[in-house]
Amino acid sequence: MFPGGGKFNPRMMKQMQKMMKDFGMDAEDLKAVKVTIELEDTILVFEKPKVQVMDMLGNKTYSITGKAKKVAKAEEKIEDVEVKVEVTEEDIEMVSSQCGVSKEEAKKALEEANGDLAEAILKLGN
């Protein structure tokens, strides 16, 4: 890639950077700690990568160099679980007497409030 038999010459690097600037290209090293790339079925994680961003006429290109670890993607699907709260007769009587409603109305309000006495009483009070 480099002229001169592949030997790296710091002066040549300076000339290349100047040429890049002349063509509207600018390169900058980023101090990245970790880079994560999320694919459809896996995740690539680069620990201690070398990241360089090149700006070419307003378009930025990121270059990541380092060793990638493949990580299995966790299944994101969470099933809805319906929780049924058991309402006690004591709670029903308390809500019924506090709000002056029938036991059926009190039970319904408690079920809608997932057993929360205060919420059921507030609901029936309005």
Swiss-Prot record:
- The transmembrane residues are none
> Where does the record locate the signal sequence feature?
none
The Gene Ontology biological process annotation of the record reads: protein transport
Q: Which Gene3D superfamilies match?
A: DNA helicase RuvA subunit, C-terminal domain, Nascent polypeptide-associated complex domain
Residues in NAC-A/B domain copies: 10-77
Q: CDD domains recorded for this chain? A: UBA_AeNAC
Question: SUPFAM superfamilies recorded for this chain?
Answer: UBA-like
Domain of life according to the entry: Archaea
InterPro entries under this entry?
NAC-like_UBA, NAC_A/B_dom_sf, NAC_arc, Nas_poly-pep-assoc_cplx_dom, UBA-like_sf
Q: Which UniProt keywords apply?
A: Protein transport, RNA-binding, Transport
Name the Pfam families on file. NAC, UBA_HYPK
Q: Does the keyword Aminoacyl-tRNA synthetase apply?
A: no
Protein transport as a keyword of this entry, yes or no, is yes
Could you cite one Gene Ontology molecular function of this protein?
RNA binding
Similarity section: Belongs to the NAC-alpha family.
> What HAMAP family would the database entry show?
NAC_arch
Main role? Contacts the emerging nascent chain on the ribosome.
Assembly, in brief, is: Homodimer. Interacts with the ribosome. Binds ribosomal RNA.
What this protein is called in its record is Nascent polypeptide-associated complex protein
What gene, per UniProt, encodes this protein? nac
